[in-house]
Regions:
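Active-site-proximal loop/hinge segments that shape catalytic or ion-binding/gating pockets
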Residues: 1-217
Length: 217
């Protein structure tokens, strides 16, 4: 269990998108500031599914209190080294071209900083497109520590049928609707020192960059 003040959320992107993010922040797909030259690294089929998928927010109960469109929100994970990253790096599903770890950058924000924006947000207790996943709104944010399974989220081992539940819970998401200004980015994670130098050349301070090859596959 974590203190809400210590929770960080993570988003990965191609290094080519970083200059735009430094200037405009993490932008929503419908934002006036969106990156017209955005370089995608994700599973195009999953992106397509999410763009139109309706989900019910039930706050863990049987009755839906609100229906939202998953594709209207910017998704974050609660830790590094997610199953989707494995697919992005190695290919498979509908990832057209694998992406080298050196080209993948983590953008890390403090959850409490994001909450201060007062934007519409939700979070899930597992993979967002699985039918048995529950979604929660801001009325449950103070219970996030007990709703999420942190042992699963931080687990390094999730492969195989025997770990299906771990894999599902590991991919819990935080969803936010709207742009996140660059000042709320706490730090960046990259694969090695050569990429760190590239990020410094973009104008990112050394103190805001962490090298962590263990965050990759």
């Amino acid at each position: 269990m974590k203190n809400i003040n210590d929770i960080e959320i993570y988003r990965i992107t191609h290094i080519d998108n970083i200059p735009h993010i430094l200037k405009n922040g993490i932008t929503h797909k419908d934002s006036l500031k969106k990156n017209l030259n955005y370089k995608n690294i994700g599973d195009i089929s999953l992106i397509s599914i999410r763009s139109s998928k309706k989900i019910g927010v039930s706050n863990g109960k049987d009755n839906v209190v609100k229906e939202i469109n998953l594709g209207d929100f910017i998704p974050f994970y609660f830790d590094v080294r997610m199953p989707m990253l494995y697919v992005i790096q190695h290919g498979g599903n509908y990832v057209e071209n694998p992406t080298n770890a050196k080209d993948i950058i983590y953008i890390v924000c403090k959850l409490v900083d994001i909450l201060s924006l007062n934007l519409e947000y939700y979070f899930s207790n597992g993979h967002a497109t699985d039918y048995f996943t529950k979604f929660y709104d801001k009325t449950k944010i103070n219970e996030i520590n007990t709703i999420l399974d942190w042992e699963c989220i931080e687990s390094k081992y999730w492969g195989g049928e025997e770990n299906a539940v771990i894999k599902w819970k590991k991919q819990a998401e935080f969803l936010i609707k709207g742009d996140i200004p660059p000042k709320l980015i706490k730090y960046f994670i990259c694969y090695d020192n050569s990429i760190r130098e590239n990020l410094i050349n973009f104008g990112i301070s050394e103190q805001s960059i962490k090298i962590d090859p263990d965050a990759y596959f």
